[in-house]
């Protein structure tokens, strides 16, 4: 029997996580006044290529101008993928101009542990340059077949790593799985088609002391579907779930 136990690296309340497009500044105030525990301002999927620079500027401005902490929010930013030319500027500009307001960086489409190492190194250099007292945490989206196969190694990749998120939409695409609604169940499959991925990821998170967060449910006009998806995730140990619309926060 092994007596090795990994304690939780960083405890944060993350029951509900509201996704907010960085390109839509007027939504920032709505997020501020929402009931979400966690806010992630998005530079990736929710932002078109032509709006990447504007979204980055909006996020820097919004992090500094709004009293997120006073409203009890934990603040995260989803950067663009490491396979894009936007990523390095995302990290450098965010930390340079608003680093002290950021709690975590969310990395999309993490496939191998070296993806995390790259962002970790950038953060360390920037924190040292600007004498930031608080270290910025890292969260990873597991949303590809490669990421799921390597989830155990990814979970051990950095002392900054606080949470893994199950990115069901891109994960489904990576598997070529047939879906009806993002995060929903396909009636052609006799059971929960996401059970294996969800179970594997939450077990990994619990083993290494990091949080397990379920991703989006795509139809915000289907509250019952969202509630059922949230209950399924909670039943197997997930601590929280994304909301893509304030109406999904309970």
Residues of each region from the PLM?
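Expand to "…catalyze enediolate/carbanion chemistry for C-C bond making/breaking, isomerization
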Residues: 1-250
């Amino acid at each position: 029997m092994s007596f090795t136990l990994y304690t939780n690296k960083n405890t944060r309340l993350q029951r509900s996580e509201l996704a907010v497009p960085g390109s839509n500044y007027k939504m920032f105030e709505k997020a501020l006044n929402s009931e979400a525990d966690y806010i992630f301002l998005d530079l990736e999927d929710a932002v078109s290529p032509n709006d990447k620079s504007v979204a980055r500027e909006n996020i820097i401005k919004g992090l500094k101008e709004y009293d997120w902490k006073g409203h009890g929010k934990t603040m995260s930013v989803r950067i663009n993928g490491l396979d894009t030319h936007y990523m390095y500027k995302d990290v450098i500009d965010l930390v340079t101009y608003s680093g002290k307001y950021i709690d975590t960086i969310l990395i999309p489409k993490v496939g191998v542990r070296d993806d995390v190492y790259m962002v970790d190194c950038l953060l360390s250099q920037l924190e040292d340059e600007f004498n930031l007292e608080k270290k910025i945490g890292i969260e990873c989206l597991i949303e590809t077949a490669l990421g799921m196969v390597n989830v155990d190694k990814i979970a051990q990749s950095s002392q900054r790593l606080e949470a893994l998120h199950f990115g069901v939409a891109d994960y489904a695409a990576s598997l070529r799985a047939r879906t009806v609604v993002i995060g929903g169940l396909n009636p052609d499959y006799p059971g929960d088609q996401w059970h294996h991925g969800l179970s594997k990821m939450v077990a990994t998170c619990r083993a290494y002391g990091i949080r397990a967060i379920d991703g989006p449910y795509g139809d915000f006009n289907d509250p019952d579907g969202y509630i059922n998806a949230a209950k399924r995730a909670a039943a197997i140990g997930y601590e929280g779930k994304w909301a893509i619309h304030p109406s999904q926060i309970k």
